[in-house]
């Protein structure tokens, strides 16, 4: 009988707290303080960063730098932090640009191969002169 009463009390307690927990939302990953004296030779190994704004349970503006196995919080007003953010943004753009140009190259190759498959008797426009209009291939003369 006592076990039944205890189970009912626990169920009522959990039921009463469930809407409050749900209303608060998901747990946010926040920086609660800055890592002081972050040196450039550490920040240059960061893989990515995220700017944290003041909202919800995060009450501190910060920049989170993601490394292989850890996260470091930096002050957005620090010069090294600003420099690392600039370089990581440029690195991200470069990777995006390279992947876009690689996909264009692959598209061109696939279109070229597609035209060869559609018409296997076609000859390539390029000749032995590599398309140069003034160059003519002549046989070598041998001196006997």
Curated annotation (Swiss-Prot):
MF annotations from Gene Ontology: chemokine activity; chemokine receptor binding
Main location: secreted
Keyword Disulfide bond: yes
Protein name: C-C motif chemokine 25
Record's subcellular location: Secreted
Biased composition (Polar residues): 118-127
Tissues/organs with expression: Specifically expressed by thymic dendritic cells. High levels in thymus and small intestine.
Keyword list, A-Z: Chemotaxis, Cytokine, Disulfide bond, Inflammatory response, Secreted, Signal
Entry annotated with the keyword Signal: yes
Signal sequence coordinates: 1-23
Cross-referenced Pfam families: IL8 (PF00048)
Functional summary from the UniProt entry: Potentially involved in T-cell development. Recombinant protein shows chemotactic activity on thymocytes, macrophages, THP-1 cells, and dendritics cells but is inactive on peripheral blood lymphocytes and neutrophils. Binds to CCR9. Binds to atypical chemokine receptor ACKR4 and mediates the recruitment of beta-arrestin (ARRB1/2) to ACKR4.
Gene3D superfamilies, per the entry: 2.40.50.40
Gene Ontology CC annotations of this record: extracellular space
Gene Ontology annotations of biological process type: chemotaxis; immune response; inflammatory response; leukocyte migration; lymphoid lineage cell migration
Stretches for region Disordered: 98-144
Bridged cysteine pairs (disulfide): 30-58, 31-73
Family: Belongs to the intercrine beta (chemokine CC) family.
